[in-house]
Amino acid sequence: MTQLGAILIPTGNIADLDRERSRRSLGPDVRPDSKKKRNYLLTPAYRTTSLLEILGYTETQLAAYLEHIRWGGLGLGVQACPKCGSIDRHYRCASINGWKCKGCAKQFSVLSGTRVHGMKMSLKTFMSFAMHFMEAKDSMSSRELSGLHDLDYQTAHVLTLKVREAIRETMGSEGPLTGYVQADAAYFMKYVRPGNVGTGAALAAKEIQKNAGLDEDGKLPAKVNESMHALVVFVQAGQQCHRRYRIAMIKTENQVDLLTLGQQFCAKEAILVTDQHSAYNFFSGEFVAHHQVNHNKEFQTRDGVNTNLAENIFSRIRAAVHGAWHRMSVQNLVEYGWEVAWRQEMVGSDNL
């Protein structure tokens, strides 16, 4: 039996099933008068595009849809040649579902000059891939995306990396953070898998090895994973859709790296909020104001000062690790952080 076949097994009398269905809640969309504040992601306003709608489009319609996204600001039917930059109503070239430049005579498509230039998959597969990636709650693994779209795992993995790189480039190119800015850091990939505990001679050898490694206080030195790095998050506070993020990776929390990142990401007029880690001490003389929260005593001061927006990113990253990725690499740690920041920034925007 297939996995889908289990859903189609008869479970009882149809009349009983209809009565059970009538007793069920019909969801939040049928209660518009409810005074309880609803998550924007649950409202019809969020669902501007659906996967079923995308799958119903032809390749030509999808090309026109992407053309509007890329060149819509230039005018109706106007394209910009990726080769020479000529902006015109170029000759239509049906053989490649694209255009031929009036200036340099080069052929190009809507994906030419982008990160997916020369992509072999169809636009329908590409749009479905993008829709699944965007609609995932925390994230979606490359293996799952490869299975849904009949792609080689490496193809799906590389495409997700290209998407994350585009997110980092787009969000990171904005101006410096201003106003009320929260900053925090958290360590990832710090787990060290314990070795197998043997018996007899193997256990005795392990005890000798442990005793030989005791420090001055007779304690075992802490095991540290060589891959462990700190992810630093700067968040410009504000309403949903108006928060801005900056993500960076450092080996450890230290004054030199954190001050450099603060100067790089934040305007001097910003008001910084951090915890009481000594690495943030130099922020006081660099920015207009610097508030600190003593996390040993409280998560938020009586004045409402906290770093919850920055810490929320770390919570979502850990949720994505457990629920989707299962592992991360140092090479792509920053991209994973940018993806989560992008998902958080898009809360309050439509889905496509």
Model regions and ranges:
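Residue-level recognition of single "structural anchor" positions
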Residues: 2-352
